[in-house]
Amino acid sequence: MEKITMKEKIDVQKPDDLGLDISDLRYFLVMLLFSAVVFFLLISQRLTNTFDGLWNNTWFFGGYWQVVTGRWLWPVIDALRFGIQTEPFNSLLTLSMSALAVTLLRKFFTEKDSVVTYLAGMAVLASTVTEIQLSYRFQSPVFGCSFLFSVLAAERVVRAADFRKAVVQGALLLVMSLACYQTSLDNFCLLLLTYLLLLLFRNVDREKVHAYIGRSLCSAAAGMVLYFLLTKLIVWACGWQMASYNGGADVSVLSILKNLPNAIAETYQLFGAYFFQNYYRHNILQPVGFFVLVFLALSIGLLNRFRKMLHRKNWEYILLGVAALIVLPIMCNAIMLITSEAV
């Protein structure tokens, strides 16, 4: 039997199939157990942040504020879990959804688990982002849902059988993600961009790359437009008005275009501040230049990939790859293009 190359693996992926098996269940359980151990102290001691995470009652239902800030799926999710927000139920529910999202996420980039895939998943789940979400105990499951929906949306764009299904399914899941928490748009955009880089590096057929770019752009545009229209409709049907929180009430096509140059510049500033400064404290290794070393290692790997592309003299893929790397900081902060107040 002929050996199947990495390029061919992409070509023969089954469409419309999540492809979950016993290895995925094992990975999910390991991720869930690991994250529960990491955050055991926070969960067992019922620790919360000093802002709106201080909730002592045992139940909570979202309502007016969640809807007028564009998070209209929040009350639905609260109702589905009967408003329960006691520990450890809420935190384990959140960690379960995050672990499932990471389980699906890794399948974008590999068909076989290794030490690297486990360490990568653990790094995502053990991040300060997860800790902050858990500290808002009454709303942490909504964060988990938003993360999971954003990964599922990107997964549908990649694996759906045809263009129409990819756009429709991806857009609907993106709407659900945004209706929980808008900043998950960043997850969706970054996943699609990194998968594009993977296709380019693996030298996948040009037609498939073009089709993938079309799927990605159309699903993202359709999802954001549909979310905007549904949000306006739901708020109007409730007899309310959009809140000015994070500039949400002023968002329009004109405002986005008008603020686009400043928003793009701010995405690069945030990217640099997050990884190369101590403004955002999220890793004890930051002061010793940990991320500089990580970026150097990644840069060596990327340069090697581009060297192979140069050897093939595939100038279109080289240009697409360079463009993807240039816009990567923008995709990491895509929500900033909508409203620059969403920091």
Write out the residue ranges for each language-model feature.
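Membrane-interface alpha helices of multi-pass inner-membrane proteins
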Residues: 166-182, 187, 193
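Extracytoplasmic catalytic/substrate-binding loops of multi-pass membrane glycan-assembly enzymes
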Residues: 38-58, 65-77, 181
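Perimembrane helix-loop-helix junctions
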Residues: 188-221
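Membrane-interface micro-motifs in multi-pass membrane enzymes
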Residues: 67, 71, 94-97, 115-158, ...
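Short hydrophobic/aromatic helix or loop-helix immediately within or flanking a transmembrane segment
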Residues: 64-88, 92-97
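Membrane-interface transmembrane helices that cradle and orient dolichyl/undecaprenyl
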Residues: 150-167, 201-206
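Membrane-lumen/periplasm interface segments of specific transmembrane helices
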Residues: 38-39, 43, 213-291
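Hydrophobic, aromatic-rich transmembrane alpha-helices
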Residues: 102-103, 272, 281-316
